[in-house]
Amino acid sequence: MRVPRSQPWGLALLLLLLPGTLRAAESHRSLLYHFTAVSNPASGTPAFSLSGWLGPQQYLSYNNLRAQAEPYGAWVWESQVSWYWEKETTDLRDKEKLFLEALKVFGDRDSYTLQGLLGCELGPDNVSVPMAKYALNGEEFMEFDPKLGIWDGDWPEARTIGIKWMKHPEAVNKEKTFLLYSCPHRLLGHLERGRGNLEWKEPPSMRLKARPGNPGFSVLTCSAFSFYPPELQLRFLRNGLAAGSGEGDVVPNGDGSFYAWSSLTVKSGDEHQYRCWVQHVGPAQPLTVELESPAKSSVPVIGISIGFLLLMTVAAGGALLWRRRKGLPAPWIAFRGDDIGALLPTPGLSKDAES
């Protein structure tokens, strides 16, 4: 049994096919689902997870720990029919079972990662091109042919998995229907209802701070918060002249926006000669931020926070007194039956899809 060894760097194979490499990515005319199943997940991490993409923009997330399909980023505001996310959740739970069943073919002696990329893109003539590719431990593994209705690949294990999956007639029919009909229909619906999300531009808020570094030096850190799209240029200026871009990164926030930072080591005493310059499609002009004064940044925030807490306390007390005078129960005991679930907020909101 020749199975590729797990190579973390190789798991980017299918990620390279995510929006950004397809022609459709530029105009958001692709809808792709990226599935990942792992045989031996670390404690507290999902064995199965999925992200849904409209062009270069993620709009959906799912994992077996929460077991609910949820809109991602700005797509929580997309107007959808009430059953849409329920259907998406049901379909993804079925897909989760198939992926985890497939991993059992390899046994439990080693770790395996099975990935799938399913979806479609629309060409200039609105003709849909389906995609259904799978990778094992970062190597191309098998494909699904929607016309023949079969999963197949060069590996013996791929054929074994294909036979297992084809024992579920509903799985074959759902895969064919999704790739040939549901996917392009759903894509067009998202393009129509979510046009504002696809054109979403959120300018960054900026901060430049200094902290002690090695003796005789300070470290300047320029941060850009909550911006979209992720493309952003950041550099340091010294007395108005370019002084390098420093070292940093751009990472997702988890709500669809991004966070970026860059650090530069400078001589102690020279900190106030530096500015941070940022260019992004959100603001009309590039942003320049000066070094933040610790005294200025902390006192107002603390004062505002304390004032806000006092205001909320007074308001809550007044509301409770009013309810008691009216003979009404306190708000935290007004929940009944199904409402009990609302007592604990969930990390994400729920709203749009179908698979």
Swiss-Prot record:
Residues 203-292 form the Ig-like C1-type domain. The chain crosses the membrane at residues 301-321. InterPro entries: Ig-like_dom, Ig-like_dom_sf, Ig-like_fold, Ig/MHC_CS, Ig_C1-set, MHC_class-I_related, MHC_I-like_Ag-recog, MHC_I-like_Ag-recog_sf. It is a single-pass type I membrane protein. Keywords: Cell membrane, Disulfide bond, Endosome, Glycoprotein, Immunoglobulin domain, Membrane, Receptor, Signal, Transmembrane, Transmembrane helix. It is found in: Cell membrane; Endosome membrane. Residues 322-355 are cytoplasmic. Disulfide bonds join C222-C276. GO terms for biological process: immune response. Residues 25-300 are extracellular. Residues 293-298 are annotated as: Connecting peptide. FcRn complex consists of two subunits: p51, and p14 which is equivalent to beta-2-microglobulin. It forms an MHC class I-like heterodimer. Interacts with albumin/ALB; this interaction regulates ALB homeostasis. This is IgG receptor FcRn large subunit p51. It comes from Camelus dromedarius (Dromedary). The gene is FCGRT.
